[in-house]
Amino acid sequence: MKSTVEQLSPTRVRINVEVPFEELKPDFDKAYKALAQQIRLPGFRPGKAPAKLLEARVGRGAVLEQVVNDALPSRYSEAVTSASVKAIGQPEIEITKIEDGELLEFTAEVDVRPEITLPDYSELSVTVDPIEITDEAVEEQLLSLRQRFGTLTGVERAVEDGDFISIDLSATVDGEAVPEATASGLSHEVGSGQLIEGLDEAVVGVKAGESKEFTSTLVAGDHAGKEAVVTVTVGTVKERELPAEDDEFAQLASEFDTLDELKADLRERVARVRKVEQAGQIRDKVLETLLETVEVPLPEAVVKAEVDAALHDAVHGLDHDEEALNKLLEEQGTSREEFDKDAKESAERSVKTQLLLDAIADASDVTVGQDELTERILFQAQRYGMAPEQFIQQIQQAGQLGAVFADVRRGKALAGVVEQATVTDTSGAAVDTAELFGNGEAETEEAASTDEAASDSTESEDQK
């Protein structure tokens, strides 16, 4: 087999492949074997009919078609490997010549990873906010802890912000009841915004046993995107009573004997959180600087695939009705044109980030150990409230294990850049990135390189 590569653009190539027919003998044998199992010829046991008789039955053209279709994927992969083509996504294959018994020729156009010129990381510099631990932040943590140990007590008054209520909900659209928007005995914290839009404002001032109507836009179901009249009936009203802020509470809620000891521990926790936040800010600013200074040609097909994925996600909860999406966007004060523009910009940034960090990882020979991959998987399983075995099975079935690997590798690549960059806070003090990121590796999920909200398009395309 012979192959040559033409560079069509920085992100696309055409591979020209010539395959002599003698190299297709295994493919012909496979095709005849499959036909022998499918076709019964008098005088021959199943699977034993001669190739010439099988060919006479189905025609030479049908055999050639089967052989070529079976041979193309493996010959394409062989050409990609032999030419060290860094292909992304599915190729567009065109058969250009078939000389029966002599030669098969085809071309394959495919997107590729572009060549990227990387900067001197030591010349990068960013400025971030300093770590500040205020008394107010400690008091917020203490209040949160007291709320966890609070008790709910029924009250004989109208609903106020922060109360806990039980409610019944029903809704109509154009006078017709909406069954999927009907519920009874729901528990809700007023002001949390966890249920339907407009509910928190509607229930304030309502007493137990009373009802109130308000309007809200439905976001799912057959009436998604439509304005509904919602009726809420308040069943019970409870307020949360907080324990006193004293030594007794410290002993109840922690391992400490005094409130001062508990506050000291909370201050240390706030400090750890602030360090993680600063690490995230450093990561984001270094990445932003890289994206601004490094030119990365973008493969159009990969960007389009990510835009299409964003649209698919947006209409998934709307029964894939794009008109419903357009109406919903209009009600939200935006438009489909703005949505498409934002989706394209987001896709371009996501693809550029992935390609850039992959190039940095390649140049730095970044590797990922099994323990690092396992640590990330365990973290994500915990994050989604799943057993590790269940999470692993799910990502394997979805073909996303490679994406997790790539995400860890990109995180390590970016951490290596951060280690070489100059980082100061707004007061002018140098920031010790080694303390936050370790020896060139991100040690926390927050210090990882890529936003998991964005799909890992280049990795998923590589696997196709």
From Swiss-Prot:
InterPro entries according to UniProt: PPIase_dom_sf, PPIase_FKBP_dom, Trig_fac, Trigger_fac_C, Trigger_fac_C_sf, Trigger_fac_ribosome-bd_bac, Trigger_fac_ribosome-bd_sf, Trigger_fact/SurA_dom_sf
Q: Which cysteines are joined by disulfide bonds?
A: none
Molecular function per GO? peptidyl-prolyl cis-trans isomerase activity; protein folding chaperone; ribosome binding
Alphabetized PROSITE patterns for the sequence: FKBP_PPIASE
Enumerate the UniProt keywords alphabetically.
Cell cycle, Cell division, Chaperone, Cytoplasm, Isomerase, Rotamase
Describe the reaction catalysed, as an equation.
Answer: [protein]-peptidylproline (omega=180) = [protein]-peptidylproline (omega=0)
Q: Name the source's superkingdom.
A: Bacteria
Pfam families with a match to the protein in the record: FKBP_C, Trigger_C, Trigger_N
**Subcellular locations according to the entry:** Cytoplasm
GO cellular component entries: cytoplasm
Q: What is its EC number?
A: 5.2.1.8
Gene Ontology biological process:
'de novo' cotranslational protein folding; cell division; chaperone-mediated protein folding; protein transport; protein unfolding
**Residues covered by the PPIase FKBP-type domain:** 162-243
> Does the keyword Protein transport feature in the UniProt annotation?
no
Recorded domain comment: Consists of 3 domains; the N-terminus binds the ribosome, the middle domain has PPIase activity, while the C-terminus has intrinsic chaperone activity on its own.
Q: Which family is this sequence assigned to? A: Belongs to the FKBP-type PPIase family. Tig subfamily.
Please state what the protein is called. Answer: Trigger factor
Query: What organism is recorded for this protein?
Result: Rhodococcus jostii (strain RHA1)
The organism that produces this protein has a lineage beginning with: Bacteria, Bacillati, Actinomycetota, Actinomycetes, Mycobacteriales
Gene name in the database record: tig
